């Protein structure tokens, strides 16, 4: 069992079961997560573990970050992430989290940043239906239609679905199955698609809403 781990999405492929079934999987490269800080309820008000992965050039590390990594006696990574430790597991600064904490068949939640789509209209962004192609409609085929009432309330309600920036948001896909754990190559093979583009950072943790799809 683990509180979670940070990895990088490599892409998608497929593997075959012993019965010859094709299973689509996402390959996630998980370098050892180095623990840079352990937070507790007594000192920080909540229990969490701060980790870093990868490496960064010294010229790209601020003095504050350099001091933080030096205190943890670990190499500066490309970023820091916090993993909540609500179960109260014991961790030490300088330790590592690896793929060995996961096992095949385990259900996980994967969080990442979705692909950015730029400025999108309501048809693409919110799945609105298009208006008539003919019958007097010349300019409003993909227009959203009315966005409110008249003088009462005299404004557009907050949260109204309209055109705007689509994607590039934090997204979590729940209850994905770990198909294979490759300890030698630090890889996790997870059934199905996970949020984000290849090369993006993702956060994997045990599923919070366990569901039996069998």
UniProtKB/Swiss-Prot annotation:
Keywords: Methylation, Ribonucleoprotein, Ribosomal protein, RNA-binding, rRNA-binding
Domain of life: Bacteria
GO cellular component, one term: cytosolic large ribosomal subunit
InterPro entries on file: Ribosomal_uL3, Ribosomal_uL3_bac/org-type, Ribosomal_uL3_CS, Transl_B-barrel_sf
Positions of transmembrane segments: none
Modifications after synthesis and translation: Methylated by PrmB.
Region Disordered, annotated ranges: 134-161
Pfam families hit by this protein: Ribosomal_L3 (PF00297)
Gene3D superfamilies for this protein: 3.30.160.810, Translation factors (2.40.30.10)
PROSITE patterns: RIBOSOMAL_L3
Function statement: One of the primary rRNA binding proteins, it binds directly near the 3'-end of the 23S rRNA, where it nucleates assembly of the 50S subunit.
Protein name: Large ribosomal subunit protein uL3
Organism: Teredinibacter turnerae (strain ATCC 39867 / T7901)
